[in-house]
């Protein structure tokens, strides 16, 4: 008897900085979603593709749900809600080392009206005592009737295989949408821009993160298979530009070196990376700039 192929879509939702991008990167086995210890680093719905012989699951890593403070914030939250509307399962992710807060309760209330089954994923279990984990499970169990509660460590991989088995079982019968070796539906230049932005967040001060965008101006492969990437880092203030460039260009060079290493790993080729920094005042509040920098509602 032949087993029918399964396929479907899964949304990953939760408060900012609970490990959604880390989980997605583990699922696909490669870095496609930006990771940082600073909140609200995922801005577009990143689609990662998990493929095994009997199933294919498309994962959507949404921006962390928060109270918007500007147009970009509105976009990020709307993007998260759109992701939850038409999926076969929703993973509500919380962090074991953070107490349940108003933000979690807000998301839970929205999830109660969800059409798809909701799984509670308790991440970072490697950071808490087992007794504390039991009390967390008990607390969340009182808030909503979850399909299943699955404790994991996205960083260490604890319980990861069980999570994937559960999700494959949940998926309906369906075709394989993407080739076996495709791990995201985003073009390479998008992933490249995210890798550069990740390094900016990693290396600069707290005032930078939510004011930065990265635009890849060109990506060209030469006759020696070396990839030439030109990209512009967009900030809102001259002071931020100074921080990113650094004394004698030192910070920009560091950003470029670290980003280049990740881009070479992604493309499996040598990369020549050129970076510029440009000031575009208040870009997060201007629709035209949001579109120019890749935030388009019709795409995400």
From Swiss-Prot:
Region listing for G1, in residue ranges: 14-21
Disulfide bonds: none
Annotated stretches, region: G4: 123-126
Era-type G domain ranges (all copies): 6-173
GO molecular function per UniProt: GTP binding; GTPase activity; ribosomal small subunit binding; small ribosomal subunit rRNA binding
Pfam family, one: MMR_HSR1
Region (G3): 61-64
Domain KH type-2, residue spans: 204-281
Stored PROSITE patterns: G_ERA, KH_TYPE_2
Residue ranges, annotated region (G2): 40-44
Assembly, per entry: Monomer.
Family matches, as PANTHER family: GTPASE ERA, GTPASE ERA, MITOCHONDRIAL
The name this protein goes by in its record: GTPase Era
Organism: Enterococcus faecalis (strain ATCC 700802 / V583)
């Amino acid at each position: 008897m032949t087993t029918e192929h399964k396929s479907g879509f899964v949304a990953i939702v939760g408060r900012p900085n609970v490990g959604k991008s880390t989980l997605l990167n583990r699922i696909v086995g490669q870095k496609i979603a930006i990771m940082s210890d600073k909140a609200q680093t995922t801005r577009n719905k990143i689609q990662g593709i998990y493929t095994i012989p009997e199933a294919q699951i498309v994962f959507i890593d949404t921006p962390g749900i928060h109270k918007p403070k500007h147009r970009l914030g509105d976009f990020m939250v709307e993007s998260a809600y759109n992701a939850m509307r038409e999926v076969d399962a929703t993973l509500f992710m919380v962090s074991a080392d953070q107490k349940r807060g108003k933000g979690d309760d807000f998301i839970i209330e929205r999830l109660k009206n969800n059409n798809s089954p909701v799984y509670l994923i308790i991440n970072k279990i490697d950071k808490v005592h087992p007794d504390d984990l039991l009390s967390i499970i008990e607390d969340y169990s009182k808030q909503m009737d979850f399909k299943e509660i699955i404790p994991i460590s996205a960083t260490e991989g604890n319980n990861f295989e069980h999570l994937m088995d559960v999700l494959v079982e949940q998926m309906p019968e369906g075709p394989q949408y993407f080739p076996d070796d495709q791990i995201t539906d985003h073009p390479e230049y998008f992933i490249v821009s995210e890798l550069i932005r990740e390094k900016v967040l990693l290396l600069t001060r707290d005032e930078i993160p939510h004011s930065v965008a990265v635009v890849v101006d060109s990506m060209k492969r030469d006759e020696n298979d070396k990839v030439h990437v030109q990209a512009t880092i967009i900030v809102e203030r001259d002071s931020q530009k100074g921080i990113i460039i650094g004394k004698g260009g030192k910070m920009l060079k560091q950003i470029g070196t670290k980003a280049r290493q990740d881009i070479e790993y992604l493309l499996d080729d040598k990369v020549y990376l050129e970076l510029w920094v440009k000031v575009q005042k208040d870009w997060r509040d201007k629709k035209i700039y949001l579109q120019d920098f890749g935030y388009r509602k019709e795409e995400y």
